[in-house]
Amino acid sequence: MKVLALSALLSLASAASISRRSDFCGQWDTATAGDFILYNDLWGEDNASSGSQCTGVDSASGNEIAWHTSWSWEGGSSDVKSYANAALQFTGTQLSSISSIPSTWKWTYSGSDIVADVAYDMFLGSTADASSDEYEIMVWLAALGGAGPISSTGSTIATPTINGVTWDLYTGPNGDTTVYSFVAQSTTEDFSGDLNDFFTYLVDNEGVSDSLYLTTLEAGTEPFTGSDAELKVSEYSVSIE
């Protein structure tokens, strides 16, 4: 899920190689690292009866980052508690102007009784800023412990194969935003592909207009419940071309 924040100019230092830092644990704590802002983003923590989460940078350089997040959450089993994520900093770009969005993502998850997703979260709107988002596009590399996406019916609307992976596609509303969720049929811990292929599919098959702007591109995890959990991202990269 996206939380709007004031954008900040990246300093020259942020483009340099960055090594491991201390973890941050506050609800809205962030760290700028390379081309990314890393968010702890405990937006749903009030849905938990107890729990906490901390996130940290392991290394970063340009459009590549390694990072981790550790958490334990109890209660509110049907509610997402957070979305720790690495958000690419870029100017909103019209889909028709994008030729490719190459991305790699290698990760592992450990812990007990984990219910969570590991997912890209992207937004499309009629303007280049994030004030007019109409669509949320999620690409779930994993649905752990029975986690499920937003869906009007609970049923898939298609099962496309994109970037060599077969996905269950769901759709449903989140307020005024239409959500499309591509959920990998098998957990994919080592992903390499072109995220633009998902937008091309939606333009060709679901009536999404290529005049819309990509305004947000994030990658992280949405936990529901679990204990002593850690998502470790050993390699993540993305760029818009």
From Swiss-Prot:
Locations listed in the record: Secreted
Sequence similarity: Belongs to the glycosyl hydrolase 12 (cellulase H) family.
A Gene Ontology BP annotation from the UniProt entry: cell wall organization
Signal peptide: 1-15
UniProt function note: Catalyzes endohydrolysis of 1,4-beta-D-glucosidic linkages in xyloglucan with retention of the beta-configuration of the glycosyl residues. Specific for xyloglucan and does not hydrolyze other cell wall components.
Pfam (any one): Glyco_hydro_12
Name of this protein: Probable xyloglucan-specific endo-beta-1,4-glucanase A
Domain of life: Eukaryota
Record keywords: Carbohydrate metabolism, Cell wall biogenesis/degradation, Glycoprotein, Glycosidase, Hydrolase, Polysaccharide degradation, Secreted, Signal
Enzyme class: hydrolase
Annotated disulfide bonds: none
InterPro entries: ConA-like_dom_sf, GH11/12, GH12
Molecular-function GO terms, alphabetical: cellulase activity; xyloglucan-specific endo-beta-1,4-glucanase activity
A GO-annotated cellular component: extracellular region
Catalytic activity: xyloglucan + H2O = xyloglucan oligosaccharides
Matches recorded under Gene3D superfamilies: 2.60.120.180
Primary location: secreted
Keyword Isomerase: no
Enzyme Commission number(s) of this protein: 3.2.1.151
Glycosylation site positions: 47
